[in-house]
């Protein structure tokens, strides 16, 4: 639609809009009211009368211009409605034609669907145009295509993104398509079969069905009835598919729906395209409910029950969701412009200055890790140097040389590291230090498992140096030493050994070799490849991978520590007991760790839990709701260990707590990823009942007071234990990111934020009424009383400071949204102040703008507007498609919260860690907003 405005300071202003549709001409003229005019105004429109109508022949005789007959319609355009003022022929006579009466009646109806588009005079005229075209289509005239230019209209920009090939599927262009055509058609004499069309144009295998429908639509328009095409025909197909114009895109989509090519879309055809789109996006729920959604579209676009809709009706539906995307796109562009200068990478010309800045940024972001590592490395260096100098002054140095110094120096570091490697896994101690002291501000407790792994590497290096120095240097020198040189060694080794075997078969040799073998087994099975089951072996060796293998192999260290003490007591060269220091290094850590294990066993036995509810969700997720032991206190973001004797009496596995501290129960959501979790799901599935007819398709079982209850397996819990996410209350603004089942700690935080906000409201109401804090508020937020009294623990982490939370949940499957549907709805309903901004991303759905998700986007907007429920997630939270643009996420938060300190908490696959952390560093360095990145570690 083309708009023209003529402004002159001394003349009355008029506004005219003209739209040319084939041979039909519609012109609008009237006073210019402008987009801000609230009074409305009258608009006149002249429309060509189809020759097939009565008025086109009777009234047109005296009103023809350029061989066309016109009818003049005067409209009263107001803020939210369009009313017909009069309908006359061009000659001025009133019209009584039945069709025009129907036209007038239709124009007087308010458009519910298009209400969001009616923003100014121009958009109101466009609405009228749509209604006129829809009613004119009752004359069953052919729909002309490609005859009008919308390149400057808002609709063109909104629908420019209706791409039929995603960025990843078809961005290579015609050259790549032509190359694939030549490869595919080499054995078929230059003809491309329908089944290979999707592959040829770059679509993946999962879109094969969609590609077939696209082929049929393109072939129908060209009257191609064969199941194969040549290169010239493929070029025509590609030109239409790759065409960015509004009309080509819309017409292609219409052709895909209108399979019988009669120019109308029936409910059956709508149902088919919904099923096709749902299948392409792996949305099984929508596919099952295609009848319901097809009926919803027909109800909205066919209010007169004609049994079909035209392309204009489809266009109106298409305009809804993409228009929102245009707004979001504009916002994104504004964000980019506002931060472009700050985020623009500028190369520092001086390499020394560049290096200094990088180094200072590194220290600023990692100073906690740096000082701990420097202290640890410094202690190892001191111990190694001390032992080296000590043995250099002994008689053994004259025989074995520097080798004995290297071996003993490495041994001293091994003793240190075998002692401190236990400290990072003393979870109760670490949790107590996090909660009760201020050490968390200086000690990176979040990196406890990473430090544990680093120490393990240092032990491996120490063992290698110690063993190789003895086996390849010290022992051969003792065997080959002369009698005179060996004489000082008789006191330590006895008579000079005659063979290498003498050293190996001794207590020192046997214990050393066994320790190395056991350590190698434990280290190997603890690597990500074995622990996560990425390595597969044939039976019966398949049990050597997975978490069970890791868990049991790690307990070999009970034997290792026993042998280490024996090994340290049977030293050849050191005879005085008080100089054998192995037991001195190990005593305190071993006692501490043993105490932790005893505490875990004792605590789990006295704090029994009762299973209240079990549910098995899509995506192989088991939800366990348990009774809350008396006095059991925890923070959102923390985790606990779970043991089920029916699966394994000895294994304990960590899981994030998904309930909030204010809830009267405990809950965990466990995804089947390994052997133990698979067996656990099997055990609990056996006691669950299949869903009754018409109910949710979930396996579930509930504990009901006084009734026959299922025989639930016995479950023990141990915890809670500290985790990075528990510190979210220290930040006024938090960004919570969960990938798949990694949303579990974030869900607890979301619930806790809602409970805290609710408690604060209740507290304010109670204070206004002169009462103390209500019991409900205390239960919802146990820490609120401390905040009110300005008292907190030494850690200062109990006060609730969070004022804004952004929650991003990214999952691959639609069924995953069922895991926390109730919690998401509760949060959306209770968050009256808009504290929590929730975003669900379903990566199985093609990105916005891809035709395979175009109809899903339309359905989503229509259904959400009518019922407030998202069709993808089944919650009040509207879902997004494909993956988030994390850079834009950080941008928006940086703009919304300048000078703020934002806590970023992530739980999920390691692949995303690097990107999120790098964005946090970049935006912290280049904007006034500081992002603190935290990752969950188990």
Curated annotation (Swiss-Prot):
Topological relation to the membrane, as annotated: Multi-pass membrane protein
EC number: 1.11.1.-, 1.6.3.-
Residue ranges of domain EF-hand in the record: 245-280, 289-324
Cellular localisation: Membrane
Tissue and organ distribution: Expressed in leaves.
Ranges of Polar residues composition bias in the record: 767-784
Binding site for Ca(2+): 258, 260, 262, 264, 269
Residue stretches making up the FAD-binding FR-type domain: 599-727
Pfam family of the protein (one): NAD_binding_6
One Gene Ontology cellular component: plasma membrane
PTM: Phosphorylated by CPK.
Transmembrane segments annotated in the record for this chain: 370-390, 403-423, 455-475, 510-530, 546-566, 581-599, 733-753
Ferric oxidoreductase domain location: 408-565
An annotated Gene Ontology molecular function: NAD(P)H oxidase H2O2-forming activity
Segments for region (EF-hand-like 2): 222-233
Residue ranges that the UniProt entry lists as topological domain Extracellular: 391-402, 476-509, 567-580, 754-938
Coiled coil: 115-141
PROSITE patterns in UniProt: EF_HAND_1 (PS00018), EF_HAND_2 (PS50222), FAD_FR (PS51384)
Cytoplasmic topological intervals: 1-369, 424-454, 531-545, 600-732
Subcellular location, principal: membrane
Region annotation (EF-hand-like 1) ranges: 185-195
CDD domains with a match to the protein in the record: EFh, NOX_Duox_like_FAD_NADP
Oligomer status and interactors: Monomer and homodimer.
Function: Calcium-dependent NADPH oxidase that generates superoxide. May be responsible for the oxidative burst in response to pathogen attack in the leaves.
Family: Belongs to the RBOH (TC 5.B.1.3) family.
Entry protein name: Respiratory burst oxidase homolog protein C
Source organism (scientific name): Solanum tuberosum (Potato)
């Amino acid at each position: 639609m083309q708009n023209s405005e003529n402004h002159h300071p001394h003349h009355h202003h008029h506004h005219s809009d003209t739209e040319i549709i084939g041979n039909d001409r519609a012109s609008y003229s009237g006073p210019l009211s402008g987009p801000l005019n609230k009074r409305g105004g009258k608009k006149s429109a002249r429309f060509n009368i189809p020759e097939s109508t009565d008025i086109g022949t009777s009234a047109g005789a005296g009103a023809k211009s350029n061989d066309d007959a016109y009818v003049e319609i005067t409209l009263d355009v107001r803020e939210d409605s369009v009313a017909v003022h009069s309908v006359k022929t061009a000659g001025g006579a009133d019209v009584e034609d039945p069709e025009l009466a129907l036209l007038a009646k239709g124009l007087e109806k308010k458009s519910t669907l298009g209400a969001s588009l009616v923003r100014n005079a121009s958009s109101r005229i466009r609405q009228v145009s749509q209604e006129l075209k829809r009613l004119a289509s009752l004359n069953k005239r052919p729909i002309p295509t490609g005859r009008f230019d919308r390149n400057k209209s808002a609709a063109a920009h909104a629908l420019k993104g209706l791409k039929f090939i995603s960025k990843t599927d078809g961005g290579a262009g015609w050259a790549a398509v032509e190359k694939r055509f030549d490869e595919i058609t080499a054995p078929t004499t230059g003809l491309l079969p329908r089944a290979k069309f999707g592959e040829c144009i770059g679509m993946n295998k999962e879109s094969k069905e969609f590609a077939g429908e696209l082929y049929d639509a393109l072939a129908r328009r060209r009257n191609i009835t064969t199941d194969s095409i040549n290169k010239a025909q493929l070029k025509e197909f590609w030109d239409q598919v790759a065409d960015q114009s509004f009309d080509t895109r819309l017409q292609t989509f219409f052709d895909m729906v209108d399979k019988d090519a009669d120019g109308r879309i029936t409910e059956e055809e709508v149902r088919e395209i919904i099923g096709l789109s749902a299948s392409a996006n792996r949305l099984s729920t929508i596919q099952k409910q295609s009848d319901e959604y097809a009926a919803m579209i027909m109800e909205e676009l066919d209010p007169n029950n004609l049994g079909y809709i035209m392309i204009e009706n489809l266009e109106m539906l298409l305009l809804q969701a993409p228009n929102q995307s245009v707004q979001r796109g504009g916002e994104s562009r504004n964000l980019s412009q506002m931060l472009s200068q700050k985020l623009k990478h500028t190369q520092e010309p001086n390499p020394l200055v560049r290096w200094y800045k990088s180094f200072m940024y590194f220290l600023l972001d990692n100073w906690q890790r740096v000082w701990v590592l420097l202290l640890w490395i410094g202690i190892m260096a001191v111990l190694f140097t001390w032992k080296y100098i000590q043995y250099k002054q002994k008689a053994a140095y004259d025989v074995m040389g520097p080798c004995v110094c290297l071996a003993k120096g490495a041994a001293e570091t091994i003793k240190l590291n075998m002692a401190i490697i236990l400290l990072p896994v003393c979870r109760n101690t670490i949790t107590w230090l996090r909660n009760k002291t201020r050490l968390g501000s200086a000690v990176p407790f979040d990196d406890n498992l990473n430090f544990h792994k680093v120490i393990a590497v240092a032990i491996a290096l120490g063992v290698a140096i110690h063993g190789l120095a003895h086996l390849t240097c010290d022992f051969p020198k003792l065997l080959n030493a002369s009698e005179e040189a060996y004489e000082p060694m008789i006191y330590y080794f006895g008579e000079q050994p005659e063979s290498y075997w003498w050293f190996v078969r001794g207590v020192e040799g046997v214990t050393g070799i066994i320790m190395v073998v056991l350590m190698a087994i434990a280290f190997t099975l603890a690597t990500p490849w074995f622990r996560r089951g990425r390595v597969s072996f044939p039976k019966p060796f398949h049990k050597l991978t997975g978490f069970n293998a890791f868990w049991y192999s790690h307990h070999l260290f009970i034997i290792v520590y026993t042998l280490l003490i024996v090994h340290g007591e049977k030293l050849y060269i050191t005879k005085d007991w008080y100089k054998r220091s192995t037991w001195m290094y190990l005593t305190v850590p071993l006692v501490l760790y043993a105490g932790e294990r005893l505490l875990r066993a004792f605590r789990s036995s006295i704090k029994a839990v009762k299973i209240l509810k079990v549910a098995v969700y899509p995506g192989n997720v088991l939800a366990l709701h348990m009774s809350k032991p008396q006095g059991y206190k925890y923070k959102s973001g923390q985790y606990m260990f779970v043991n089920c004797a029916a699966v394994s009496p000895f294994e304990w596995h960590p899981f994030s707590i998904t309930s909030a501290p204010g809830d009267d129960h405990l809950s965990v959501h466990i995804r089947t990823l390994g052997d133990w979790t698979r067996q656990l799901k099997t055990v609990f599935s056996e006691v669950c009942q299949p869903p009754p007819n018409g109910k949710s398709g979930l396996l579930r079982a509930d504990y009901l007071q006084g009734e026959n209850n299922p025989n639930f397996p016995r479950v023990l819990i141990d915890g809670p234990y500290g985790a990075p996410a528990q510190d979210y209350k220290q930040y006024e603004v938090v960004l919570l990111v969960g990938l798949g089942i990694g949303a579990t700690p974030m869900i607890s935080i979301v619930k806790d934020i809602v409970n805290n906000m609710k408690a604060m409201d209740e507290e304010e109401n109670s204070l206004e009424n002169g009462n103390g804090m209500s019991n409900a508020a205390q239960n919802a937020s146990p820490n609120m009383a401390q905040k009110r009294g300005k008292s907190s623990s030494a850690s200062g982490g109990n006060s609730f400071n969070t004022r804004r939370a952004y929650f991003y949940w990214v999952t691959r499957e639609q069924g995953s949204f069922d895991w926390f549907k109730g919690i998401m709805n509760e949060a959306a309903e209770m968050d009256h102040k808009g504290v929590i901004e929730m975003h669900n991303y379903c990566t199985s759905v093609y990105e916005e703008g891809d035709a395979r998700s175009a109809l899903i986007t339309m359905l989503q907007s229509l259904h959400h507007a009518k019922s407030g429920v998202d069709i993808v997630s089944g919650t009040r939270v509207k879902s997004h498609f494909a993956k988030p643009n994390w850079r834009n996420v950080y941008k928006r938060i940086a703009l919304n919260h300048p000078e703020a300190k934002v806590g970023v908490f992530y739980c999920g696959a390691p692949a995303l860690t690097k990107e999120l952390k790098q964005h946090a560093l970049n935006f912290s360095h280049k904007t006034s907003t500081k992002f603190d990145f935290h990752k969950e570690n188990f």
